[in-house]
Amino acid sequence: MIKKGLLLPLMAFAVSTALYAEKSTQLELTSPGGVHKVKFYGKTSASGANGLYYTVDFKDKSILKESKAGLHVDNRVWEMALGKRTLQQPECWMDNMEIDSVSYSKHSGEWTPLYGERSLVKDNYNAGVVYMSKKDKSKYRLNVEVRAYDEGIAFRYFLPEHPDAIFHKVTGDLTEYSFADGTMAWSEQWAQGWFEHLDVNALTNPVER
């Protein structure tokens, strides 16, 4: 079962340490305590279109099967206005995006919330970045910034500034969440509400948590 368009929790980014990069087409991260594991990798379809995918494991058990990741961007009008009228226009913006390299870093720290049940929150994670680009002379790039916490997985898309000042018009979020059949979730429709233990297929309306 695939869920699309869900919002990931936003988390404040801090300075990372021990950064190193490698030439690879796959990023693999494990949280500091080995609780969560996430992979990002590229695949090419029979038609020749590229795709970005990811998986998530919890305590060596798959909780998110192979799921699609990425953005759809429509810059056609802006490209034409700047005289770039010969660029490829693939069906999906990600179709000709390729992984160039990945980088890794670690972070260990604490932060103080403005309010809440705890006065001090641990901020420990392993991080990585997937660096992608197009090879069609468009100079488009996309970075996927990933973090693995013992409490969960977080990732976001980052579009580096284009060298020719082409504006990025994001028109769709391609991120999918492929759960195994029978996956259950504790759901609450509003703060201080009651939790229900439901099959994820039953979550047809937005919920707060």
Question: What are these model-derived regions, one by one?
Answer:
Residues M1-L8:
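Bacterial N-terminal signal peptides that target proteins for export
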Residues L8-S16:
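Bacterial N-terminal signal peptides
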Residues S16-T17, S31:
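A general, composition-driven signal for non-globular sequence regions
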Residues L19-A21:
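Boundary at the C-terminal end of the N-terminal hydrophobic targeting segment
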Residues S24-R209:
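N-terminal accessory beta-strand-rich subdomains and adjacent acidic, glycine-rich linkers
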